[in-house]
């Protein structure tokens, strides 16, 4: 069973700041070795390929409705206040959930 979800309500939270960089700055993915994938369709695709995300991130309203479906998907679940999730998303219409996956290491020559 995964640990309880971590709830974040402040934009000053360091994890929120890190997630926002990852979601909005393409260079951050390369620097951090992780990628932000937004939307339940991408989370379902990861699950179908047996990819276990490092983080699953939910808007609070989404978590209240779908925690039972997603609770075991990632190693850690993060629940953001709805306005924070909207600020995190680079999409015009935020999907209300996303995942962070570890990127494979580049092949060595």
Describe the residue ranges of each PLM region.
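RNA substrate-binding interface of SAM-dependent RNA methyltransferases
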Residues: 2-3, 48, 100-109
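Glycine-rich nucleotide phosphate-binding loop and flanking beta-alpha elements
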Residues: 43-44, 64, 86, 105-107
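Short, exposed beta-strand "edge-strand" segments with a Pro/Gly-rich flavor and a Y/T-containing core
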Residues: 33-36, 52-54, 73-80, 104-105
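Glycine/small-residue-rich loop that forms an oxyanion/phosphate-binding "nest" at active or ligand-binding sites
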Residues: 66, 70-102
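Short, glycine- and charge-enriched coil/turn segments that flank and shape catalytic ligand pockets
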Residues: 50, 62-76, 107-109
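Boundary-proximal intrinsically disordered activation/regulatory segments immediately upstream
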Residues: 1-65
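Short secondary-structure boundary/capping segments
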Residues: 26-27, 34, 69-70, 88-91, ...
